[in-house]
Amino acid sequence: EEKMDEYQIWSNMNSGLISNAIYFAGIAFLLWVAFRAANQMRAEDAGVLNKTLVSLFSLGIIFNGLFTGAVLFNILEGTAYSLAQLESMSAFSQAFVDAYGVNPPEAGMNIFTANPINTGWWLVITVMIFGRIWTKA
């Protein structure tokens, strides 16, 4: 069985981080759209149907944000696990493994527990958006 070398592992991690960042940029744009829509719902005193549609749109964005945060940790933990499988590694790689552990990444990652800070941040976003949609001015 042929294993990747240290450089290949770091390259794969960087590719994953770049992809994750691009995906998050799209989520950030859609989050801005959701806040604009929530503000519009409040300004127009919109009906229940419109508020429900904007709520569902916002929940989709929030789900994708949670998923992106979980994927980020999966990339980092997967990199640490791959580095730990090497026979020898640099001091920097060893420090990375020490920071993220040597457990294999979860196959069925939980978007709520993968990154508690990310989960808390998205909870605040959820309250902010739904507060704008469903409360009176």
What is the meaning of each model-derived region?
Residues 2-35:
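Cytosolic-side membrane-entry/anchor segment at the start of a transmembrane helix
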Residues 6-15, 100-114:
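Membrane-interface segments at the starts/ends of alpha-helical transmembrane spans
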Residues 23-30, 55-65, 119-126:
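Hydrophobic alpha-helical transmembrane segments of multipass integral membrane proteins
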Residues 28-39, 111-137:
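Transmembrane alpha-helical segments in integral membrane proteins
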Residues 36-44, 72:
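Juxtamembrane helix-break-helix junctions at the cytosolic face
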Residues 42-58:
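Alpha-helical transmembrane segments and their helix-start/interface "positive-inside/aromatic belt" motifs
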Residues 53-80:
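Hydrophobic alpha-helical membrane-insertion segments
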Residues 71-99:
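Juxtamembrane non-transmembrane "cap" segments at the membrane-aqueous interface
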